[in-house]
UniProtKB/Swiss-Prot annotation:
CDD domains: TPP_DXS, TPP_PYR_DXS_TK_like. This is 1-deoxy-D-xylulose-5-phosphate synthase. HAMAP family: DXP_synth (MF_00315). SMART domains: Transket_pyr (SM00861). Catalyzes the acyloin condensation reaction between C atoms 2 and 3 of pyruvate and glyceraldehyde 3-phosphate to yield 1-deoxy-D-xylulose-5-phosphate (DXP). Its EC number is 2.2.1.7.
Amino acid sequence: MDLTQIQNPSFLKDMSISELEGLSEDIRKFLIEELSQTGGHIAPNLGVVELTIALHKLFDSPKDKFLWDVGHQSYVHKILTGRAKEFGTLRQYQGLCGFPKRCESEHDVWETGHSSTSLSAAMGMALARDLKKTKEYVIPIIGDGALTGGMALEALNHIGHEKTDMIVILNDNEMSIAPNVGALHNVLGRLRTAGKYHWVKDELEYILKKIPAVGGKVAATAEKIKDSLKYLLVSGVFFEELGFTYLGPVDGHDYEKLFETLQYAKKTKGPVLVHVITKKGKGYKPAESDVIGTWHGTGPYKIESGDFVKPKEVAPAWSAVVSETVLKLARTDERIVAITPAMPVGSKLEKFQKEFPDRMIDVGIAEQHATTMAAGMATQGMKPFLAIYSTFLQRAYDQVVHDICRQNLNVFIGIDRSGLVGADGETHQGVFDISFLRHLPNMVLMMPKDENEGQHLVYTAMQYEDGPIALRYARGNGLGVHMDEELKAIPIGSWETLKEGTQAAILTFGTTIPMAMEAAERLEKAGVSVKVVNARFIKPMDEAYLHDLLGKNIPILTIEEACLIGGFGTGVVEFASENGYHSALVERMGIPDRFIEHGSVTKLLEEIGLTTDAVVDRIHTMIPSKQKRA
């Protein structure tokens, strides 16, 4: 079948099971081929082909509302709703988004990117439906990994209490990104092997009521028997206790069983949870055999071999520099523990986990819990290293404020994927952390200019015992610089002059330092002398350095790959104003006041005007005397 000719899912209504099975093969082949060129979330989508087709066949989108938790598994949904022809642009600038996008299709009723939000949003839609007295199905699809998130459990509790009509699809592949952890995962494991409790209890009631005269009474008396049967057949039926009708587990790759179960769910009043067992990566051997999450989301790859197509790496990944330095220090300090919310592979903590399994804690998709747990460990003299992506740290903001900073606890937060991350787009850009951490009392915030300084700042953080300290580091690789063998502590709040200059100054840090240095060199050739400063401590700032610099009365440009509002540049302007300097001398470059879409980091930087050319032009406009343009 030519998938690019699909306009909407209505064609599925008249297809036979054998035809649907052929469509499944076509979709898997299409995904494997297309994603080999663009990269993307290949394994999750290969696992939900039959489930997605079954949902679109039996329900009527967009009237009936599908909410894809996290959203990375929505590619099949996009194909069935007329977007197959756009897959060549997947996750590219102004191309097809890798997550549901409301402006992209009327079938995308809820935007996602972070986990565990679908149930709460579905509850809101269902309540709105009931208040408006309309009739449509609301169907959140959530994975077993996302179900470990506290927000999802809060929503389950509320939905079950209110007895709201809703069909929750639990897509259980025993794996979110990395293997799942936690007691709820174990409950699901028991359910997988328990068989279909709900079918048995309903058939029992039907048979009892067929007995003449006494059948109804026997059936009523049997209610307690059914409750006992529930525990006998389904050990630990968590969802029934919350007020859901539990259906399953059902084979998520068997159309007959999917249709039977979903049709039953459609007729059932109140909240229903359909437990679907799927195989992540189904249909592509390298993805099927992956047990650690390598094929969850990938770049381009070679279909035949399963080898990833990667540029030759000339420098270590930032995540590896940080995690391996923490591991090195942990060998001589038993107080150091590493904590991750379900991202051990992404944060490069596999080596730490292998060497110190008792001191490596993966809490699952539970950022709030991870953060407060780290605080609790710090009260007992441990040195917790909390490795967390910038975008996911947003989810633990109150815990950082209330539990870490307020108590001034020695927690080292490694803020991975800081700055623009590219293809994952709006939901994953790490551009807000400076603004929401800089104003917190007791917080120290740093970002290194290269991987050598990065390892020294990790050492600095582990030596620091006066409160919380956080290190920002980017996605991708470092610069390939020489790495010192001996680690050293860098004085807290100290900046570094990278290039002397007399006519203007650039204050920046991290990934924008090469941009600033290149701009300064070009300006130098044009006769403009520009100082470049490595402002590696975003907080506290080097106040002595700032006093000296502002006292020279020269233009100052701050550059940051983070949002301007409340950012580093704002801090410099505030310092100038509060200390009687001419704050108009300070201008800022950074992320504007909007969400940044998906695309390559290079393209996105060009789009927002954060380039070497833009820096050169800005410095020219800031210097009063006319200069030859570089």
